[in-house]
Amino acid sequence: MESLALYERSAASSYLKNLVRRLFGRFYWVTYSSALSYKGLWKNGLFEGHGELKYSNGTKFSGTFSNGLKHGKGILVSSSGYRYEGDWVKGKKTGFASIRYKNGDGFEGEVKDGLRHGTGQLHDALSKLSFKGSWHKDIIRGDVNISSAHWCFEGPMPNSDGLTRGEMRYSDSSIYLGNLKDFIHHGAGSLRSSSGDCIDGIWVDNLNVHKATKKDKHGVYWKGNLRNLKPQGYMHVKLPNGQEYDGLWENGSMLRALSVKNRTGQVSPYHMH
């Protein structure tokens, strides 16, 4: 783009030296071979103020110029679908801008030399995800905010294996804090569900938890494994009144009680009747 900007500047200068200045000395339309055409203001033989550029490849620019270069606010639209609306500095895309890429992605934020650089938000058309954070030469770095239609993540950008640790907020008001893989619960973490349940443990995915501790909205305390977020296998249960018991569970239903501890701490085996 720098070489093109220099071309625009030199082309305008050489042509205008021989141009009969007319039309109030302010507006003109001029075509430089098949490369580009310009309509707008000029000063001292160079593009100056507001003008419009049209390129032979279909690209169009409308905005302000200074000393023959794009400078200030402007909109660049290409025939491929790329659209840039924002700041320009000495012919370069630098400042704040709104960009639509030809693949459908969109970006709003700070740019430098045409690259995402600074604070900004990228909307990915394919995944339907939105990435908000700090950018360096088109790459997002540090802590990010990633959101979809159903959840929002805050934490470090996932590595090449999709692993990270952070906070997930869901549309049903559930909140998860812990390890993730591809934005699925994976490893140590805790969940506070919209129903009031609090679950800590080693997560296999969003529904299955090993070595789990769970306290439900009624104050019942569970310790064991969860499948589909329901008690599965051997579980230790403590009731709000202090009574405790051990049992075997299947898909959230108790198959049998193994032992019972009363409020005085005495433990006795539970006999099936």
Predicted regions, residues:
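Glycine/tyrosine- and acidic-biased, solvent-exposed loop/turn segments at the edges of beta-strands
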Residues: 1-273
